[in-house]
Amino acid sequence: MALPFALMMALVVLSCKSSCSLGCNLSQTHSLNNRRTLMLMAQMRRISPFSCLKDRHDFEFPQEEFDGNQFQKAQAISVLHEMMQQTFNLFSTKNSSAAWDETLLEKFYIELFQQMNDLEACVIQEVGVEETPLMNEDSILAVKKYFQRITLYLMEKKYSPCAWEVVRAEIMRSLSFSTNLQKRLRRKD
């Protein structure tokens, strides 16, 4: 999908803002961005989830990757970044743009993009801080496979409104897990 010029400019400004800021700060501001993302996802609902019960599917969310206790901070942040990146990719497809209100979708893109930039700055800083920044490739691969299952499901369901509703609810659930991981990381600081 070709992003509108105004949205592209907003993303460039956000990119410059987070690139120029110093340090990793998974602050209350970042938590507020997460809540706004979840609120936007809730507002994007177009049909009742109850009308789509027959389409429910277990996408096998890799919850163990979001437990956060076994990770170094850089590893956990890398997993969070991958989650945001894959969510952005999923919702920026041509089939996705047809399923959602364009204004809400653009706001959603901006929130996700800001979070990705914030997390990227944190990864860069944390890799320099930790002695052995072993990036947990298995965890990142688990997140990618999770999104591959979601994409395959949408294709099998021919991107139906109910399939998108099931996916929207699933992404809200996964974003809630990522929000909880971020809270645990902030408490460690």
From Swiss-Prot:
SMART domains: IFabd. One of its GO terms (molecular function) is type I interferon receptor binding. Disulfide bonds join 24-122, 52-162. It is found in: Secreted. One of its GO terms (biological process) is defense response to virus. Residues 1-23 form the signal peptide. Glycans are attached at residue 95. CDD domains: IFab. Keywords: Antiviral defense, Cytokine, Disulfide bond, Glycoprotein, Secreted, Signal. The keyword Secreted applies. It comes from the Eukaryota. It holds the Pfam family Interferon. Produced by macrophages, IFN-alpha have antiviral activities. Interferon stimulates the production of two enzymes: a protein kinase and an oligoadenylate synthetase. Belongs to the alpha/beta interferon family. This is Interferon alpha-14. It comes from Homo sapiens. The lineage of its organism: Eukaryota, Metazoa, Chordata, Craniata, Vertebrata. The gene is IFNA14.
